[in-house]
A protein has these predicted regions:
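N-terminal active-site segment of His-dependent metallophosphoesterases
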Residues: 2-75, 137, 142, 149, ...
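Generic beta-strand structural signal
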Residues: 26, 58, 125-126, 208, ...
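Residue-level marker for buried hydrophobic side chains located in beta-strands
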Residues: 24-26, 56-58, 93-94, 161, ...
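Extended active-site neighborhood of metal-dependent phosphoesterases/phosphodiesterases
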Residues: 18, 45, 64-159, 173-194, ...
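Residue-level detection of beta-strand scaffold positions
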Residues: 25, 132, 158-160, 254-256
Length: 278
């Protein structure tokens, strides 16, 4: 049986820093300990050696096949610390369904120079953006209420939400009906700039008129799967890789990058409310 898991937290990571642009990495579905995970990790390290990187948003399914057994589980070394040893960056994780197959609470208790996850769902500020991490495996009414309050209280020019499951997806798992009904309207109403996720093992960008752009970066190292692009999908590819986002005062640029460093997709969006319409 899973252990009790703490609920929500806010992490103040920019209390002493003035508002500024921020660039970060995001990917999920990574924790296999196999060569493909190391290939993505090495590609991220090479990219961040040539480009500014503030942190990594880890999008869930952090440990395959069944989470971790505790904070001393050898998987921490084999499937996290070793693959990302060349990255001197903090990781800000979300929980995925495979994490719940083990003791999800251990992922909250574990601490290292790279890993810090204060709660099942939480928020933190980095420069011009505030990030809201959601638990989509157990998306409760309490969590929905927390997210609604947190988004309303935020004064950040940019708001980014991320979790594990996609709201919409062209991959094998497809759309998540509960998130389409509950989460999507909240993101649209709150002026959220992006929703980032994994779960489907591919890279995809969905940018449908009138909705929050959604970026799937499930190419972190687990086995790839087929996809069939749906309406609104502007990029979809079954390939290992990661996302890279740069946010400045008025624009945000998303790049989707393969393990050989090739930028497969790049697009720039204006800040929500800065003369743009959904």
């Amino acid at each position: 049986m899973s252990e009790p898991v703490a609920q929500a937290a806010a992490v103040d990571t920019a209390a002493e820093a003035p508002p500024e642009s921020v660039s970060f990495i995001f990917f999920g579905d990574a924790g296999t300990g196999e060569p493909d995970q190391f290939a993505v990790a090495n590609a991220v390290a090479q990219w961040c050696g040539a480009h500014p990187c503030r942190f990594v948003a880890l999008l869930g399914d952090n440990f395959y096949p069944a989470g971790v057994r505790g904070v001393r589980d050898p998987q921490w070394d084999r499937k996290f610390e070793q693959p990302y040893g060349a990255l001197d960056l903090p990781f800000r994780p979300a929980l995925g369904n495979h994490d719940y197959y083990g003791h999800a609470a251990a992922e909250l208790r574990y601490r290292s120079a790279r890993w810090s996850m204060p709660a099942r769902y939480y928020s933190y500020r980095e420069g011009l953006a505030e990030f809201f991490v959601v638990d989509t495996e157990r998306y409760t009414r309490r969590e929905q209420a927390w997210l609604e309050r947190a988004l309303a209280a935020s004064d950040a020019p940019w708001k980014v939400v991320y979790g594990h499951h996609p709201i919409r997806s062209s991959g094998e798992h497809g759309d998540t009906p509960e998130l389409k009904t509950k989460l999507a309207p909240l993101l649209d109403a709150a002026g959220v700039a992006f929703y980032l996720c994994g779960h489907d093992h591919d890279l995809e960008v969905i940018d449908a008129a009138g909705t929050t752009p959604m970026v799937i970066a499930g190419g972190g190292g687990a086995g790839l799967r087929t996809l069939t692009p749906q309406p609104g999908s502007v990029y979809a590819e079954s390939v290992l890789g990661f996302g890279y986002m740069t946010i400045d005062a008025e624009t945000a640029t998303v790049r989707m990058i393969k393990t050989d460093g090739t930028v497969q997709f790049e697009r720039t969006w204006p800040r929500p409310g800065a003369g743009s319409a959904r």
